[in-house]
Amino acid sequence: MKMILTLLLSIASFYAVLVLVNLPAPFVGLEFESGETPRLWFAPPGYVIPIVWFVLFTLLGIGRYQLLQTGQAPYQLWLYGLAVLCAAYAYYTLGLAKLTHISALWFGLTGNIAVIAFALFVAWKLFPVSRPAAWLTLPVVAWTVFASCIVLGEMKLEKLI
């Protein structure tokens, strides 16, 4: 029972990161457009994106649990750092676009590259101490690479590249 509770609390802690980081966003004028039809054939409908992040943050929580089970608790900070970077997407895309009047797509692409690089670094740091935790980090890379393809497609449609 204690193991299940630890697992659930690990997962819940990553959901808390997602919520707490994004709670101020609407109060500082950052809003994602919803209900917009994707313009690219491979872009998922808008409602899919929060579901994917729900799954990815669940995997990060399971990764934390793996670290706790192997006595490598200090390494969980790498996972939390990655979670904060991922959750801060609205701030480094929409927020910077609002401040600079430069397309959010540029900031999205730059941010995605940073997320990919940091997620790979985190997986590399975790691999020697917990291979499952390292592997559970890699879906963030896969999703963010896919999201970057969407951003690049949108940039092409907007004639930014």
Task: Name every feature range the model reports, one short phrase each.
Residues W124-I161:
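Terminal transmembrane helical module of multi-pass membrane proteins
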Residues I4-L5, F42-P44, A133:
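Alpha-helical interaction segments
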Residues L20, F32-V129, K156-I161:
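Portal/gating segments that form or line small-molecule/metal binding sites
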Residues A25-F27, I51, V140:
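Hydrophobic residues in alpha-helical membrane-spanning segments
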Residues I11-L30:
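Alpha-helical transmembrane segments of multi-pass membrane proteins
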Residues M1-I11:
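N-terminal membrane topogenic signal
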